[in-house]
Amino acid sequence: MNRLALYCRQGFEKECAAEITAKAAELEVFGFARVKDNSGYVLFECYQPDDADRLAKEIPFRELIFARQILVVGELLRDLPPEDRVSPIVGMLIGVVDRGGELRVEVPDTNESKELLKFCRKLTVPLRTAMREQKVLMARENKTRPVVHVFFIAPGCCYVGYSFSNNNSPFYMGIPRLKFPSDAPSRSTLKLEEAFHVFIPADEWDERLASGMHAVDLGACPGGWTYQLVQRSMMVHAVDNGPMAPSLMDTGQVTHHRADGFRYEPSSSKIYWLVCDMVEKPAKVTSLMIQWLVKGWCREAIFNLKLPMKKRYEEVSQNLLAIKEALDTAGISSEIHAKQLYHDREEVTVHVRRMWSAVAGRRDERD
């Protein structure tokens, strides 16, 4: 098995391919990407044996922007016999995966694959049973062991492989299953909820998404992102010239500032979170976020960058580099991650966390 399969949003295959090619080259691993437009996945074939396994271990999954999942796979299994689809799949894994912890039978996230998904659900139980008999899977699920993937791209055609549980998406098909809250002002609320799941470790939520924190939402109207902050009992400064949902204002947790998000400056020194989902050029939003972070107006920020039609990977990379260089120049240590979330469209979501100041006398923690 010497290739990677990467799941991605339909229509973003070229960006996913450019990214994995660049990341592999950084590790001096070379190969070529196979891209089929609107397929929802990318294949990266390595030139040297065992390089795919190395990449799946050594490229930090959380640093991949456009990939929803990364796994090692072998040759495409074609024309699986209808009378016995299980045996060829299991046979390909014997000697490759020993006592995997979980089985996921998946498809690309496309409209064309929806019918195929129903078949995958039916196949999962007999596959799991056969894999346990052959010791490909453990008798019980184990979250610390490799995950076995069977990835159907068409009826009777699938890739078979594995991912590492400490360097993959924990979600089936790489998609967190979130339910839209009926009282939320807009569906955009799911973007921020997903961002919390992707960027903030679950065991740090009580500390970093704590009740009583102060937050600012730039371009807040009608309040989809503010809703998530209010649900976590934060005090929110919502900045927008447009109206906010009355249900949010009635909580007493929201202060509405009728102002331009690009001109607003906080009067409070207690702001921990900054969130922003404004429809504007990526460079302009990036410049605004740099201002907030360098001036210490917030400790963590989550914001969206709307993408152009062309050179989207390059655009994102340039803006992330601009943030890093600005913070480095200011002597501020930081963590910077970006992801095209399931609930994103022509955009990516960025998370920046100020860690500490490298300059003597500069304060990072706000009073």
Swiss-Prot record:
Active-site residues, record numbering mapped to chain: 306 (proton acceptor)
Enzyme class: transferase
InterPro entries listed in its UniProt record: RlmM_FDX (IPR040739), RlmM_THUMP-like (IPR048646), RNA_MeTrfase_FtsJ_dom (IPR002877), rRNA_MeTrfase_M (IPR011224), SAM-dependent_MTases_sf (IPR029063)
Positions of S-adenosyl-L-methionine binding: 188, 221-224, 240, 260, 277
Keywords linked to the UniProt accession: Cytoplasm, Methyltransferase, rRNA processing, S-adenosyl-L-methionine, Transferase
Catalytic reaction annotation: cytidine(2498) in 23S rRNA + S-adenosyl-L-methionine = 2'-O-methylcytidine(2498) in 23S rRNA + S-adenosyl-L-homocysteine + H(+)
Enzyme Commission number: 2.1.1.186
Molecular-function GO term, any one: S-adenosylmethionine-dependent methyltransferase activity
Entry GO CC: cytoplasm
Main location: cytoplasm
Keyword Transport tagged: no
A Pfam family the protein falls into: RLMM_N
Gene Ontology biological process terms from the UniProt entry: methylation; rRNA processing
Alphabetized SUPFAM superfamilies for the sequence: S-adenosyl-L-methionine-dependent methyltransferases
Subcellular location: Cytoplasm
Matching Gene3D superfamilies: 3.30.2300.20, 3.30.70.2810, Vaccinia Virus protein VP39
Function text: Catalyzes the 2'-O-methylation at nucleotide C2498 in 23S rRNA.
Description of how the protein assembles with itself and partners: Monomer.
Family statement: Belongs to the class I-like SAM-binding methyltransferase superfamily. RNA methyltransferase RlmE family. RlmM subfamily.
Protein name: Ribosomal RNA large subunit methyltransferase M
The organism of origin for this protein: Serratia proteamaculans (strain 568)
